[in-house]
Amino acid sequence: PVLQDFSNKGTLWGFVPFVDEQQPTEIPIPITLHIGDYNMDGYPDALVILKNTSGSNQQAFLLENVPCNNASCEEARRMFKVYWELTDLNQIKDAMVATFFDIYEDGILDIVVLSKGYTKNDFAIHTLKNNFEADAYFVKVIVLSGLCSNDCPRKITPFGVNQPGPYIMYTTVDANGYLKNGSAGQLSQSAHLALQLPYNVLGLGRSANFLDHLYVGIPRPSGEKSIRKQEWTAIIPNSQLIVIPYPHNVPRSWSAKLYLTPSNIVLLTAIALIGVCVFILAIIGILHWQEKKADDREKRQEAHRFHFDAM
């Protein structure tokens, strides 16, 4: 079970209870898990606000999605593990809301925390950079609305804004050759300070293989029977895909724009490629220089031979 109390060094931490008052002194925030794959392993992690049950302190904590190791989660085979010793998060006292956001647009989810300020009506925003470094890959997908404010002009594809409700799913092959798939929904909640990501970051783990298939579906009007779904193939890892479902009822006409996300892996690959080219050029230069010296030596020997023959 997720909604349970957690114990750490004799201290009991639990979710902040929702207080329904007639005249609340502060904004009541219901229990909310903000989901995001911070380590790009393909399993959704969570950020939560926990309160010390024996005191008044409440903090933001990271819950990592890990394999199950007890009997309470055998059927799900996964569980959330609380990270208690994250120094930067622990320094933020009286946290109210914590969520994920890709601040640097590099596909790695950072953390944004809203906490109480020095006065009663004052709040502070904290941003924490995710320094996670691993040989992991991702694909970032955002599905737009494909709408115009008025009639859409001809030969111009309308972008619109990100819409709630789309469903994204991919299939690929992992590093061991096994079939792997993953899925996510876009903007499934809008109320109660949901603060969900405006896009979907799907972790691929350590598999650098292309995505064999990526499916995108959008909600259909009530009474319509046709499925609004389109498929794209051979999607490059560490890329961002912007899907424009226009027109909505003709999935074959939907378009997608693919943007590559620069990363350290690309830089290291370029450096390695340049190094190999320089090494090959150095070998070619040395061989050419040796061959030139050998040719000069042969020419001198030929000149001496003709000179002695003339004598």
Swiss-Prot record:
Keyword Cytoplasm: no
GO CC annotations, alphabetized: extracellular region; plasma membrane
Sugar attachment sites: 52, 70, 181
Family (UniProt): Belongs to the TIP family.
Subunit structure: Interacts with RUVBL1, RUVBL2 and alpha-tubulin.
Subcellular location, record wording: Secreted; Cell membrane
Identification of the protein by name: T-cell immunomodulatory protein
Membrane association type: Single-pass type I membrane protein
Biological role: Modulator of T-cell function. Has a protective effect in graft versus host disease model.
Spans through the membrane: 266-286
Major subcellular site: secreted
Keyword Glycosyltransferase: no
Keyword entries, A-Z: Cell membrane, Glycoprotein, Membrane, Secreted, Transmembrane, Transmembrane helix
One Pfam family in the UniProt entry: C2_ITFG1
InterPro entries found in the cross-reference section: Integrin_alpha_N (IPR028994), Tip (IPR024881)
Gene: ITFG1
